[in-house]
Each structure stands twice: as structure tokens, then as C-alpha cells.
Regions:
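Conserved glycine(s) of the Walker
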Residues: 118-120
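A noncatalytic interaction/capping subdomain that flanks phosphate/NTP-handling catalytic cores
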Residues: 1-116, 126-136, 141-212
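Hydrophobic positions on the alpha1 helix immediately C-terminal to the Walker A/P-loop
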Residues: 123
Length: 212
């Protein structure tokens, strides 16, 4: 039986919000998340035209309070503000985001993941230069399972790479990059190591025990 998809509506409200208090779940330079009885409140300190955003507990309704001024900068900020809500509802539908660069090789998507600065984009760009492999996304990839097979779904968020696609491709595998000054090698990890390393690279929401 196919699970029913959970949908999401995003409303833009061009006025100041009614400030809501709540329990702080996350706070960093770019995002603060508070929880209250009816849902979540999100604040985006670096996105000056985004006043505040509210989301129901199940993610079906999002209200973004923002400036009515239409500028290239404001639209870019709005695009970035929508991402956590999209990733929340994607996770509710069994799809998870992995910080990685991806390419298409032999009709399958291959992801290269590692810490920032590890060389994900350098690696995929070398594949393109040497073998002509198309690049799919330069920063973030959404993975899900359908009928026992894993797929990578195209999304528009791609960091500063400018590389993204709307295509859906079968997942070939995930290469987890490391660094060793003395040697270049491949290692086959144990199942437990694979799960742990991939989870460390996930961008999907993990604000509460339920989301983890």
C-alpha cells in the first residue's frame, strides 16, 4: 500500500507578525527555532526582509512574514528561507537531504560527501573534465526510497555552486571523502559505519527527538 503524501502550503504575509514565545530548540547565526503548543516559530537573523515564519507541527501550513518590497536580494532571501520548510515536509514523506555534490555516471546518481573544504566539488568537476559526466547538484541532494530502490530527487538549493537539476535519478552510491596526507585509497565501511557517516552529513531537520 502506498503511503499518502503529506502536502504543504506556504503563505507569504506582507506585514509584521504577532510575536510568539516558545521553547528554544535551535539557535545559531543564521536560524533560530522556537516550539510552542501549536507549532514552530523560525527567525532568520541574516535575512533582513524575513521578519518571522510560523509552521504547524505537521508542516502542512507555513506562514512567512516578510517585506513587500520586491528586489533581487529579497527574493533570494525568500528562496533560502523556504528551504528548511521544504526539507521538513520532505522528511515527513521519507526523503532526506545529504550535504554532497553529485554527478550522473552510467545512468545513476553518485554522491560525494564530506566536511566543508574536503573537495566534493573539486572531485565531481574532475569527473566532468576527464569523463564528461553531467553534474547534478553542487551542494545538496535529496534521497528517498521507492519500491525497494533508492533515488536522488532534483532540488533547486545548491549552495553557491549554481549547479542543480529537476531530474530524478536512481542512486548508484555515496562516496564519503576523507583525507590522508600519505595515501590515496578506497575503503569499504561496515554497515554501521556507513549509517553513522551518512547521518553526519545530513541536512534534514533534527530539532526534536521525533525528527531524529
Amino acid at each position: 500500500k502506498t503511503a499518502q503524501k503529506i502536502t504543504q502550503e506556504i503563505h507569504l504575509i506582507c506585514q509584521s507578525p504577532t510575536k510568539q514565545n516558545g521553547t528554544v530548540l535551535l539557535r545559531n547565526r543564521e536560524l533560530s527555532i522556537l516550539e510552542h503548543a501549536d507549532g514552530y516559530v523560525m527567525l532568520f537573523p541574516t535575512l533582513k526582509n524575513i521578519f518571522e515564519a510560523h509552521m504547524t507541527k505537521d508542516g502542512h501550513l507555513v506562514q512567512i512574514y516578510c517585506s513587500s518590497a520586491v528586489t533581487e536580494s529579497n527574493l533570494e532571501n525568500l528562496f533560502h528561507a523556504i528551504r528548511p520548510f521544504f526539507l521538513f515536509i520532505a522528511q515527513k514523506n521519507g526523503k532526506f537531504a545529504v550535504h554532497s555534490a553529485s554527478l550522473l555516471y552510467k545512468e545513476k546518481a553518485w554522491l560525494f560527501s564530506g566536511h566543508s573544504g574536503m573537495g566534493k566539488s573539486t572531485h565531481t568537476n574532475l569527473w566532468k573534465e576527464l569523463f564528461g559526466t553531467p553534474l547534478l547538484n553542487g551542494d545538496l541532494n535529496l534521497i528517498g526510497e521507492e519500491n525497494g530502490q533508492f533515488f536522488v530527487y532534483g532540488i533547486p538549493w545548491c549552495g553557491t555552486s549554481g549547479i542543480c537539476t529537476t531530474e530524478k535519478q536512481r542512486l548508484g552510491g555515496i562516496v564519503l571523502l576523507g583525507r590522508d596526507a600519505k595515501d590515496n585509497r578506497f575503503e569499504i565501511m561496515t554497515p554501521a559505519e556507513r549509517v553513522l557517516r551518512v547521518m553526519q552529513r545530513m541536512i534534514s531537520p533534527s530539532w526534536t527527538d521525533e525528527l531524529v
